Design a protein with these regions (language model features):
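Accessory interaction regions appended to the cores of large information-processing enzymes
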Residues: 1-244
Length: 244
């Protein structure tokens, strides 16, 4: 499936979903070209950004890290700065969500296709890892309570999970396997906290667009009429480690 950016792809996917299709989607990729000498070319875009002055540094840092070239920077009225970048299209994949977070919803980002240019080299999209279910079963409050210390959860108690499914976002860069089906062992000794209710942070429920932005190159988004699930391409943990 090909389209003009993540928004166009999400519309196509949502239409297929409503028609009853069940399928898996990998991370969006750009279409490369090659010149007459066999040199790899990639699509480039011009990005025009209006952002409050205090957030301009974060935006510049993020886009230069995504192979963007700052071509213009000028002050605007009301304490805003206008930035102009030339950036590979793949550098914008998954960025809009980060942009909204970094600017606290106060930034404006518009892009237009420029041309095909020389390939800019490898790029790392995500700086956080995934929390991966270790075994199949039903998510238990106790297991989720221990897991939420690692990062942001995507599921709530009672949801069915299987080995290899992504149940949350790790606060650190690496992936971690966790057991969200873990139950508390019963003992004859009553602990002082036995009667305390375990409180869970409200899980993050991602939209289709957010899920498409989130998935990494080794992950898939499972799309069904009822659910959106993120999983590893290789479900078995042993095989996944060998492949890595």
């Amino acid at each position: 499936v090909s389209g003009l950016g993540e928004l166009h792809l999400s519309v196509l996917i949502e239409n297929m979903r409503r028609e009853g299709f069940e399928f898996a989607v990998s991370k969006a990729e750009v279409i490369y070209h090659y010149d007459e000498n066999g040199k790899k070319l990639e699509p480039m875009e011009n990005a025009y950004i209006d952002v409050p002055d205090e957030f301009s540094g974060a935006v510049i840092q993020k886009l230069t890290g995504r192979k963007g070239e700052l071509r213009g920077m000028s002050p605007m009225h009301n304490g805003h700065t206008r930035l102009e970048f030339n950036i590979p299209s793949r550098g914008l994949i998954g960025y809009r969500g980060e942009f909204m977070t970094d600017t606290k919803g106060n930034g404006i980002l518009n892009t237009e296709f420029d041309d095909y240019g020389p390939y800019k080299g490898d790029m790392f999209y995500r700086k956080t890892g995934s929390l991966i279910a270790f075994e199949s079963g039903e998510a238990i409050t106790y297991g989720l309570f221990n897991a939420q210390e690692r990062g942001q959860l995507f599921i709530k108690p009672g949801e069915k999970v299987y080995a290899g499914i992504v149940v949350g976002q790790n606060a650190k860069a690496e992936d971690i396997e966790i057991n969200v089906c873990k139950t508390k062992k019963l003992t004859n000794t009553r602990s002082s906290s036995a009667d305390e209710a375990l409180r869970l942070v409200t899980p993050k429920v991602m939209s289709l667009e957010e899920a498409l932005e989130f998935i990494d190159t080794d992950e898939l988004l499972e799309v069904t009429p009822e659910n959106l699930r993120i999983r590893k391409k290789i479900l078995d943990p042993t095989m996944r480690k060998r492949a890595g």
